[in-house]
């Protein structure tokens, strides 16, 4: 699940309902990445509140002890790198223990340098390359979305581990476009 922001209260709510993978947008540096990890883990490794016996994730307490003992190590944490500043800090973000994947946001990255959706811009290309090379040099997983002329196939061939290819809104929009060109059936 992608959270709206790096908010420990929202993160706790999502984890309590059983979310096992968390994507957090606009992570700019290691301090923010560490805050995500801390929000996911129970004390003493983090700050997540321990109301686990009431949470759906622990089957409302029926598996409370098992959940408490394993959950801190079983949440997949994805930090989104989406700005020029974040790319310059990507090595330190990737070095945070507990972060499993770095997900590059090419659209927001292009906007952050004043060239929204101009993926052929040389500065954008250099920033993408820097981020990709830095992440590949770690043991972190690498993710992104298709952008410019980069297709899903291209990105997997470039060793991305996750490529988000469609969202519900885009699928609904395309279906509506197809319906709009058809003759009404009434």
Feature-to-residue mapping (PLM):
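Expand to "…catalyze enediolate/carbanion chemistry for C-C bond making/breaking, isomerization
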Residues: 1-186
């Amino acid at each position: 699940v992608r959270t709206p922001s790096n908010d420990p209260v929202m993160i706790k709510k999502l984890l309590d309902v059983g979310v096992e993978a968390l994507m957090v947008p606009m992570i700019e540096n290691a301090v923010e990445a560490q805050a995500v990890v801390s929000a996911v883990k129970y004390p003493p490794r983090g700050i997540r509140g321990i109301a686990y016996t009431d949470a759906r994730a622990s089957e409302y307490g029926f598996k409370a002890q098992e959940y408490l003992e394993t959950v801190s190590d079983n949440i997949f944490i994805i930090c989104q790198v989406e700005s020029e500043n974040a790319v310059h800090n990507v090595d330190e973000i990737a070095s945070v223990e507990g972060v499993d994947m770095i997900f590059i946001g090419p659209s927001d990255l292009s906007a952050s340098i004043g060239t929204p959706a101009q993926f052929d811009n040389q500065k954008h290309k250099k920033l993408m390359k820097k981020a990709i090379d830095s992440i590949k040099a770690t043991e972190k997983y690498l993710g992104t979305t298709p952008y410019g002329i980069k297709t899903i196939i291209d990105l997997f061939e470039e060793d991305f581990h996750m490529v988000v290819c469609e969202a519900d809104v885009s699928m609904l929009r395309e279906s509506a476009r197809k319906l709009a060109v058809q003759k009404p059936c009434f």
